[in-house]
């Protein structure tokens, strides 16, 4: 009886925790830098982060990979930081740092003891204003990025799934090319190309600084003025591609041969941009299909039919209309056509029948739990605030977006399954071992 008692208590606690709004202060500097500050004295740490509104989407077609390349290059040092010492400052202060790049944005952060707030601000101001964009660092990071691509994409089984799926799903929109980009583009680029990219996008009016943790708001404002106020606003318009991808009119099927032992299936469905009403329904539908051991794909295809060893479905959370990736890796000896039929059958069931009340409630609980988990650290809060501000211009969605999920109904799941997860709206890839190639 004990687990039955504990579960509702935990769910209630999660709901209570999330009902406590995350308070924050927001304002703009005269140079266009958006500032978001969250004060929390529960632990003596602070997360200092800067999000730039630039990703692979903003790259030139013959210079792909620049956004991700800069994620590496901007740890090379600056006018006042020697090469290789950026990380040393953070490590010696007892903190850690990292960065990541996506189709729409690039994100840098440090998590430090709260008495090192000024250090984090200085490091990020150096990155914004004085970064070393020169031949030595460029050549060093070219080799680093090439090795990363070899390890994570080219030589990783199934490592090219996202790349191959997206380049077929999008033909005109820059989501067509991968975030890591083409190595020949990085090789062909000259120092002037990199300097121009830095000038075009690494500017205060294209950035959000988000700080969460053991801070004093007024003192933090003064420190931000010291390190960022005098950085000049960028010149010229920031390049934002405005491209509408034509709709798919029929299913596109293709075959990819890879160095894998087991074949796989990859289905990419076109979906709306994140933040739209239907996106929330699509995300919950994807959770129904693949999140957890009791999800539809897992139960039917992996556990009951034993046709696959791994399954998944996830929407890409993008600024423009994007894609939902669904995949299954076949079990040994399973005919790939049988696996495809089983995947389609799982989707067809959601298209024909309403999800049960109990199953729908479980998804709602998962959504709430995911929200609590995403924002239970200072680093998580800083990133969430920055994401909401960048994608939607509304950082307060950290407190209100959950209501958008709560408005989704069982009927919405059935509707979006038919509208977006239909065969005429997808790219279907057979992922086969290389020896099978004729």
Identify the role of each PLM range.
Residues 3-14:
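Sec-dependent N-terminal signal peptides
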Residues 17-19:
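Boundary at the C-terminal end of the N-terminal hydrophobic targeting segment
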Residues 21-40:
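Short N-terminal segments immediately surrounding and downstream of signal-peptide cleavage
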Residues 28, 88-237, 273, 304-305, ...:
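Charge-rich, well-structured scaffold segments of protease-associated domains
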Residues 32, 45-48:
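Start-of-domain marker
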Residues 48-111, 177-180, 291-307:
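M16/MPP (pitrilysin/insulinase) zinc-metallopeptidase core fold and M16-derived inactive scaffolds
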Residues 150, 167, 236-294:
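His/Glu-based metal-binding/catalytic segments typifying zinc-dependent metallopeptidases
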């Amino acid at each position: 009886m004990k687990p039955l008692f504990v579960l509702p208590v935990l769910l209630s606690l999660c709901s209570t925790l999330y009902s406590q709004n995350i308070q924050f202060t927001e304002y703009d500097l005269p140079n266009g830098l958006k500032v978001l500050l969250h004060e929390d004295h529960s632990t003596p740490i602070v997360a200092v982060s800067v999000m730039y509104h630039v990703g692979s989407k903003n790259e030139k077609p013959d210079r792909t990979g620049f956004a991700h390349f800069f994620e590496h290059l901007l740890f090379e040092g600056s006018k006042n930081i020697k090469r290789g010492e950026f990380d040393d400052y953070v490590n010696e202060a007892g903190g850690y740092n990292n960065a990541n790049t996506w189709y729409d944005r690039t994100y840098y952060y440090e998590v430090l003891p709260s008495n090192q707030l000024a250090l984090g601000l200085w490091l990020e101001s150096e990155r914004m204003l004085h970064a070393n964009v020169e031949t030595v660092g460029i050549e060093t990071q070219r080799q680093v990025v090439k090795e990363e691509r070899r390890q994570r994409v080219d030589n990783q089984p199934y490592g090219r799934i996202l790349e191959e799926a997206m380049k077929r799903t999008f033909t005109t929109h820059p989501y067509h090319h991968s975030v890591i980009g083409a190595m020949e583009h990085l090789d062909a680029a000259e120092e002037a190309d990199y300097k121009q990219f830095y000038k075009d996008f690494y500017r205060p009016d294209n950035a959000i600084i988000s700080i969460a943790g053991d801070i004093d708001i007024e003192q933090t404002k003064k420190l931000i003025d010291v390190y960022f106020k005098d950085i000049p606003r960028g010149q010229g318009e920031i390049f934002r591609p405005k491209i509408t991808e034509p709709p798919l009119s029929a299913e596109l099927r293709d075959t990819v041969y890879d160095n894998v032992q087991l074949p796989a299936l990859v289905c990419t469905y076109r979906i709306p941009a994140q933040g739209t009403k239907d996106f929330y329904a699509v995300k919950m539908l994807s959770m129904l299909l693949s999140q957890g051991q009791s999800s539809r794909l897992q139960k039917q295809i992996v556990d009951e039919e034993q046709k696959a060893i791994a399954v998944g479905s996830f929407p890409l959370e993008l600024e423009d209309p994007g894609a939902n990736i669904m995949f299954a890796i076949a079990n040994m000896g399973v005919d790939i056509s049988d696996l495809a039929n089983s995947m389609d059958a799982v989707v067809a069931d959601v298209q024909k029948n309403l999800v049960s009340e109990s199953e729908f409630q479980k998804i709602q609980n998962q959504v709430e739990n995911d929200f609590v988990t995403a924002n239970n650290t200072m680093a998580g809060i800083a990133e969430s605030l920055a994401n909401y501000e960048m994608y939607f211009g509304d950082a307060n969605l950290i407190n209100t977006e959950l209501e958008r999920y709560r408005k989704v109904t069982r009927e919405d799941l059935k509707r979006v399954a038919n509208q977006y997860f239909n065969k005429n709206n997808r790219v279907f890839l057979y992922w086969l071992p290389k020896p099978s190639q004729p």
